[in-house]
Amino acid sequence: MKATISITTIFLVVALAAPSLARPDNHVEDSVGRLLRPGQTYHIVPANPETGGGIFSNSEEICPLDIFQSNNPLDLGLPIKFKSELWFVKEMNSITIEFEAPNWFLCPKESKGWRVVYSEEFKKSLIISTGGSSNPSGFQIHRVDGGAYKIVYCTNISTTTCMNVGIFTDISGARRLALTSDEALLVKFQKAATPKADLKTKLRMFPFY
């Protein structure tokens, strides 16, 4: 069960500030060097393909859906889109991340937006789930070495104190996205195929782990 206690309280105990490697113009780029644009669809893929595949949603409780990384390096995961108050996605700016999945049939009334929830079940972790607000949600993108990026979550109390979005492997071997003060999941953003072509290859909502 997902408890509803103060995420901010837990967050401030373990959050670590990280140094910035932002570009001078702060623009985030996709995997081929084009500017990341709000409203367009992308796949979040690992910077190192040997660490698994893309990002998808699933849950034993059906709704809301938690967010996972596929173990299959060939699986691009579900497409996502970003929402921002700017024309381009910029580093260290608060954004909304949500799945762009027309076959969201299991949770038709549930938001596709990402959010952070506290989980007693998974070792009192702060895991990433769906059901988030359409407003800027505290997620940011930060550049790291080698042209890769990491996704971080910053509270509305301190936008300079953030936690990394990393991987928590549960007892079933599933790789859940969760907040961590340790190693982040390093990613790149791959432009999704046309909606029709992408839907044809992603009709399933639950890719294999």
Curated annotation (Swiss-Prot):
GO terms for molecular function: peptidase inhibitor activity; serine-type endopeptidase inhibitor activity. GO terms for biological process: response to water deprivation. Induction: Induced by infestation with spider mites. Down-regulated in roots in response to drought stress. Glycans are attached at N156. It comes from the Eukaryota. Pfam families: Kunitz_legume. Disulfide bonds join C63-C107, C154-C162. Keywords: Disulfide bond, Glycoprotein, Protease inhibitor, Serine protease inhibitor, Signal. Residues 1-22 form the signal peptide. Belongs to the protease inhibitor I3 (leguminous Kunitz-type inhibitor) family. PANTHER family: KUNITZ TRYPSIN INHIBITOR 1-RELATED, KUNITZ TRYPSIN INHIBITOR 2. Exhibits Kunitz trypsin protease inhibitor activity. This is Kunitz trypsin inhibitor 1. It comes from Arabidopsis thaliana. The lineage of its organism: Eukaryota, Viridiplantae, Streptophyta, Embryophyta, Tracheophyta. The gene is KTI1.
